[in-house]
Amino acid sequence: MGLGLGVRAAPFTYAAHALAVAAAAMVLVWAIYFRGGLAIEATNKNLIFNVHPVLMLIGYIIIGGEAIMVYRVLPTSNHETNKLIHLVLHGIALVLGAVGIYFAFKNHNESGIANLYSLHSWIGIGTITLYGIQWIVGFVTFFFPGAAPNVKKGVLPWHILFGLFVYILALANAELGFLEKLTFLESSGLDKYGTEAFLVNFTALVVVLFGASVVVAAIAPVRLEEPQGYVPIPEN
């Protein structure tokens, strides 16, 4: 899957780590400072909703991105160890994403708001479903019980391609989520040029840059002299 990009993966993994920290800090500032905090149960239902963007960004997008980059961040480590870390991080991202979606439903149900009426919600449900399927297929094929070597070799390119597709879809839906929430807030009187509006927009931009860094890191070689036919993620 080497694409001859002429760049190494390392600079993009470093950029992704830095952008991940920035995005996590920004969404926490938004949820806690501007939106009043986080709560599992509260009379102010907005505090329940605030759990949703925090878990979806930090759990689903960031941890999911780190899972994708495991083979690039630790290229000289034991492959079985990398595979386990890759699997576990994706599992954590999947669980946190599902919990984040649960809190969106919880907020809607307790606030009398309809569910699944927006494009953001439709894509969100579709994406988490595809993410779950990808994780299960990866677990069965590459981890336990594990497929035959020739099957792994045939599945691997599709596993990589489908995984990146689902991740890019999740990134696009995160952008829809930022846009939808900010539009609701502005229609309720939030200053369109105020600090909070700028924070949300800049957070969304940082997420785009983070996602782009993850994708490039995933397809770029560890070393520029990789031979033709190089596959970024090992086959076994």
From Swiss-Prot:
Transmembrane segments: 14-34, 51-71, 85-105, 123-143, 154-174, 202-222
Keyword hit for Glycoprotein: no
Compartments reported by the entry: Membrane
Keyword Iron: yes
Taxonomic placement: Eukaryota, Viridiplantae, Streptophyta, Embryophyta, Tracheophyta
Domain of life: Eukaryota
Keyword tags: Electron transport, Heme, Iron, Membrane, Metal-binding, Oxidoreductase, Transmembrane, Transmembrane helix, Transport
Cofactor: heme b
Membrane topology reported for the UniProt record: Multi-pass membrane protein
Major localisation: membrane
Protein name: Ascorbate-specific transmembrane electron transporter 2
Ranges in the topological domain labelled Cytoplasmic: 1-13, 72-84, 144-153, 223-236
Cofactor binding: number and manner: Binds 2 heme b groups non-covalently.
Binding site for heme b 1: H52, H120
GO MF term set: metal ion binding; oxidoreductase activity
